Regions:
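Membrane-interface transmembrane helices that cradle and orient dolichyl/undecaprenyl
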Residues: 100-115
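Perimembrane helix-loop-helix junctions
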Residues: 137-162
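Hydrophobic/aromatic-rich transmembrane helices and adjacent perimembrane loops
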Residues: 261-278
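Membrane-interface alpha helices of multi-pass inner-membrane proteins
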Residues: 117-130
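Aromatic- and kink-enriched transmembrane "portal" helix at the membrane-lumen/periplasm boundary
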Residues: 34-35, 73-91
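Membrane-interface helix-loop-helix junctions at transmembrane boundaries of multi-pass membrane enzymes
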Residues: 222-246
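Transmembrane-helix signature of polytopic, membrane-embedded enzymes
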Residues: 59-77
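Juxtamembrane membrane-water interface segments that cap and precede transmembrane helices
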Residues: 23-30, 185-208, 221-225
Length: 315
């Protein structure tokens, strides 16, 4: 007997899912931009990030069947949690982190992939110019190269160091030329500023609700994947397990330094979108369909909450 496809299953494999989602999201961004102000640069970064997520999905076969849920989930999560005042800094960090992920997994099991490693970590170096605290991820990412991409070697390690440094090599020349080297010193000084640990005084209720929504989807996606990972190829399992690890690390960093919520939330969205997309694509049954519809409704309500209600400080 053929199983009747639920609403969730139809959406998951539809070729119209991404075009429809992108059109609706773009209309929302344009409407918000006309009312709120100039957010067109942020919109361009959001669309570019979505295209990179499409490429990440295609290059690594994140879904073992045709599905555009990775990019749909990413674009929806990014828009719902960032509007009406998206952060340009966070969008730059998000774009660079996706580019890093795409490049580093292109060197899977290749301990001679010095070029890919260099460019991957150069993306991380560019991101650190906007958000220097992302350099705290370096030990985690080297561990990821050891245990997940299986591409760690002394040559690749040296390439990663050079990749992180190279953006600052060019920036330092500019700052010396403009006699503004103090800005670069202050930039690195903020890297070791621990006076703001556990400072939740700048966090709003909106930010807490957004983080709770992303965390909920991350937990749902992670639990589902760990339960069904046997059906995926080893490389795919490694990718998803690295996403779970980075989600956990990002959440812990966010607890430690909540003032960086926008940038860390962007990294969490990159890691959470494939996990939840896997849940949407490969779960069946009435309960899962109800869960999917409930989360869609929650996303709409969260968007309306962020757009219509002014932020209120948590403390």
């Amino acid at each position: 007997m053929l199983r009747h496809k639920t609403f969730q299953n139809k959406i998951a494999v539809s070729r119209f899912s991404l075009p429809v989602t992108a059109t609706l999201i773009a209309m929302i961004w344009v409407a918000v931009g006309l009312v709120q102000g100039d957010i067109w640069t942020e919109l361009a970064f959001a669309l570019a990030s979505t295209l990179l997520m499409v490429e990440l999905n295609n290059r690594n076969a994140l879904m073992r069947t045709y599905s555009r849920m990775v990019s749909c989930s990413f674009l929806t999560l990014l828009s719902v949690t960032s509007l009406p005042e998206p952060s340009l800094h966070a969008n730059v960090v998000t774009l660079c982190f996706i580019a890093f992920t795409l490049l580093i997994w292109n060197g899977y099991q290749d301990r001679q992939s010095t070029g890919r490693t260099f460019y991957a970590f150069a993306c991380l170096g560019i991101a650190s110019m906007e958000f220097v605290q992302i350099l705290y991820y370096l030990p985690i990412l080297w561990a990821m190269m050891m245990f997940f991409t299986n591409s760690f070697s002394l040559r690749n390690f040296a390439s990663s160091i050079l990749g992180v440094i190279i953006p600052y090599w060019f920036a330092a020349g500019f700052f010396v030329y403009t006699n503004n080297i103090d800005y670069l010193i202050a930039h690195f000084a903020s890297f070791i500023d621990f006076h703001t640990l556990f400072d939740y005084s700048m966090i709003t209720v909106h930010q807490l609700v957004n983080l709770s929504f992303i965390t909920l989807l991350a937990v749902i996606g992670a639990v589902h994947f760990l339960h069904t990972s046997y059906a995926d190829k080893i490389r795919t399992r490694m990718i998803y397990e690295s996403f779970i690890m980075l989600d956990i690390v990002s959440f812990l960093f966010l607890v430690l330094q909540p003032q960086h919520e926008y940038e860390l939330e962007g990294i969490m969205i990159v890691c959470t979108a494939p996990l939840f997309a896997h849940f949407i694509t490969f779960t069946k049954g009435k309960l899962c369909n109800i869960t999917f519809i409930t989360i869609l409704v929650m996303a709409v309500l969260l968007l309306l909450y962020n757009l219509l209600f002014s932020p209120v400080m948590l403390l």
